[in-house]
Amino acid sequence: MRAMIVDDSRAQRMLLKRAVAPLGFEVIEAENGEDALSKLDTDDPVDVMLVDWNMPVMDGLALVRRVRATRAFADVFVMMVTSESDPKKMARALMVGADDYLVKPVDGDMIRSKLEQTSAMSGRLA
């Protein structure tokens, strides 16, 4: 299984990596949406993306739109992990294609719990 962590904060990427790697994910890191798109492989897509909203170059919302517009990535589970706590922004992220939304700060246990719950419910990560 492969997970991509997209966040302009190196510290945040490390925190998220420590949370998902023990679940058996090979982790790919990207600093912004454009970097993430350049690292996505249509022949071997990731299973999960953890995406920040506020990033330079291409923000998380634009990235989610692009991912959802690409047939090869239709089944990727996308979780926004961001400091944006406005309910309207949460709804907007879900409307453009995010599967879940967590507000920072989050801890590793919270991320692991969400991914395990998603796996158990949908079988998408199993």
Across the structure, where does each feature detected by a protein language model lie?
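Charged docking surfaces used in two-component/phosphorelay signaling
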Residues: M14-P22
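Acidic, metal-coordinating helix/loop segments flanking the phosphotransfer/catalytic sites
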Residues: E29-V48
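Active-site residues of response regulator receiver
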Residues: D52, T82
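Receiver (REC) domain active-site loop signature in two-component systems and cognate sites
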Residues: M55
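C-terminal output helix
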Residues: V106-L115
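The C-terminal output helix
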Residues: E116-A126
